[in-house]
């Protein structure tokens, strides 16, 4: 019985050793705002815009391949949402965009980066003319494109990295609550 347990542990360790290097290398793609506001340190890691209804803002995402190999990535926008614990999270690509994620247009959504290469990715935010005041959240997601076929077998790990976008629409917020 102990011999069987030992074989399972060794087998699992060998499988983990084969899989882990792939997952570590997948984390070598990164992004951040390309044009942070020098007066607001938070904009080094988050896009923060104050935009009125109907306004348009063009900006760039700094995309970097930290890997020693060429990588093709997808870049796309999704809605951001606040969790029950107050944390910010990004919706999935397959979910319908109903808020700020819908306002972001990224013309080039598939980008190939050579090893250690960086590129700037252009995008535009267009706030609808009629929109509620307050903060609206989106995420610009970067995800390495899966080039392996499922037919090759093994375990495939897909990771994504995102940069938060907070769009504040100015105005007075009126929240009237009536309790009967």
Regions found by a protein language model. Give the residues of each.
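Ligand-binding face of N-terminal immunoglobulin V-set domains in extracellular IgSF glycoproteins
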Residues: 58-64, 71-78, 85-89, 99-153
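Bacterial N-terminal signal peptides that target proteins for export
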Residues: 2-11
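Beta-sheet-dominated interaction scaffolds and their linkers
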Residues: 31-67, 71, 110-112, 177-180
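Short flexible coil/turn linkers enriched for glycine and charged/polar residues
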Residues: 67-69, 115-117, 159, 171-173
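Bacterial N-terminal signal peptides
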Residues: 12-21
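Sec/Tat signal peptide C-region and signal peptidase I cleavage site
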Residues: 22-26
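Short, basic/aromatic beta-hairpin or loop at an interaction surface
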Residues: 35-36, 90-99
